[in-house]
Amino acid sequence: MRIEKLLPPTPPAKTWTVALEGGKMLRVTESTVLDQGLFAGLELDEAALDALRSAAASAALRARAVNMLSVRAMSAGQLNEKLMAKGATERQAAETVAWAVDIGLVNDAEYAKALVRHYQAKGYGLYKIKNELYRRRVPKADWEDALAEMDDAEDAIDAFLAKKLRDPEDRKECKKASDALARRGFSWSQIAAGIERRKYQTD
């Protein structure tokens, strides 16, 4: 197989285009061009062609990972899952994720802290936040430090009850507010304490 043309990147693209005889196009990184000594007119044997195809697949997956992460942050587990859903093999996905971690595009510890801050700011409690960490495939090894940064739940519960519980002596109203707080991830003991505080506030 012969390389007919070797075209440099056209900004903002960063990949080189390798035009093979027969019209097949492969896009590879500059390091691949240099490492494999590519040039127009080069004849590729099967081993060299396989290596070039593998490099092109790797470059495409890295570009896809960058695009995904530019839309929103995600954990290494999420990125791996999404790459495989797009057709990457288990090995290809793992290698791409490892590359993203190595260059700092993915950082599970920082992502965990960002999730905790985000959901606590929205008024959610510990159990809801843990569920989100699990759902987003954040490794449990990164949970402890992130959860340690949570503020006390009292303020969030008190703010919610101030809006939703007008009469803390009304059992029906209390149950409705309690159920809503439970869905937000607060424990029943935290909720009960919050209702008691609300009673004193309305006396």
Model regions and ranges:
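An alpha-helical, amphipathic repeat domain used for nucleic-acid recognition
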Residues: 1-203
